[in-house]
Amino acid sequence: MGDKYIGLAKKSDDITSAIELVKKVFDENNKKENFIFPQESLKLKNIVIVKIDDNIVATCLIHNRLLYFKGKKIPSAFLCFICVDKKMRGKGISKELMNFTIKICKKNKVELSFVIARKAVDYYYSKFSFFGFSNYPKILIKTSPKPTKTGLIFLKLKNSLINEIMDIYNNTHEKLIGAFHRDFINWKFIIKKGKTKGVNLNIIKDNDSTIGYICFKGVDIYEIALNEKKYYPLVLNKFLMDEKVNRINLHMGINHPVSKNLDNFDYTFSFRKCWYGGHMIRLNYNKEKFKILLNKKIQNNILTDEIFNIPLLDQL
């Protein structure tokens, strides 16, 4: 093996080569997938590379976020697009890549690191003190819509409208353990990602006043946040009417405000947990602070201490 460098990207060519490697590794079947990357992750300080003889053979992108946890914003990071060139596997390179990436996170005072792991590699990340905390809460609504006249309208969410919903989103999600704070830049990326996933992001207005937003695909609603609880049944009923359906899958749990405003609906809660992988987390500092995570398997009141599942459009 030739000269080796393990560290942060140093020049723009490193960024280009790292992206090319990601596309090569993650699109092995040549499906021409539409890869999108948060701009913040494409900075030199957020790209870890392994070079051998000046060729990048492994990389990991760091995407910094703020996690809501017990009313506080916790410095966190997604470790994403982790990959090693197929020709260089089995040589210990992935271990070096992960160890250096974790070192950078700790140096930057990142308290929690996340990976969204493919099932085939769940076991691997556990070697670096990651553990699974995947939750899949769902509220199934089976109700025929009730014809009602309201001033509610759904409009496509555009960058120019982001400021109208940022506070509504954050005020709702700051109380949900596991949700992430979103600023304008985060929202711009989420709108872009939604398009690639075929997910609809709509701002909701009551006459001329913005009351919140909704994120959905088919009958699956992945996110909803409204500025007043009275609007939840009205918005859900409008969704049923507009989509001409009699059921909705709400991908959220009992701690979300929508769950307290379903009196006029036939609904069922379901709650699936997956401890071995999927959404995985590493506690870099202050483990005492995160007892709710460390003791996840033995909680007596597990629904009260529910960890909110990472929203689809925040996953990287």
Annotate each PLM feature.
Residues V84, G90-K103, E228-M241:
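Conserved acetyl-CoA-binding loop-helix of GNAT-fold acetyltransferases
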Residues F131-A225, K229-K230:
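Amide-forming acyltransferase catalytic core, primarily the GNAT-like/NAT-type
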Residues D122-T148, Y222-L316:
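Active-site/acyl-donor-binding loops of N-acyltransferases
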Residues I47-I49, F114, L201-I203:
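Residue-level detector of beta-strand face positions
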Residues M98, K103-A117, E243-I254:
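Conserved GNAT acetyl-CoA-binding A-motif
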Residues R65, I82, R118-V121, F130:
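An acidic- and aromatic-residue-enriched active-site/binding cleft used to recognize and process polar
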Residues M1-N64, G71-F78, K146-F184, V219, ...:
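Short amphipathic alpha-helix that is part of the acyltransferase structural core
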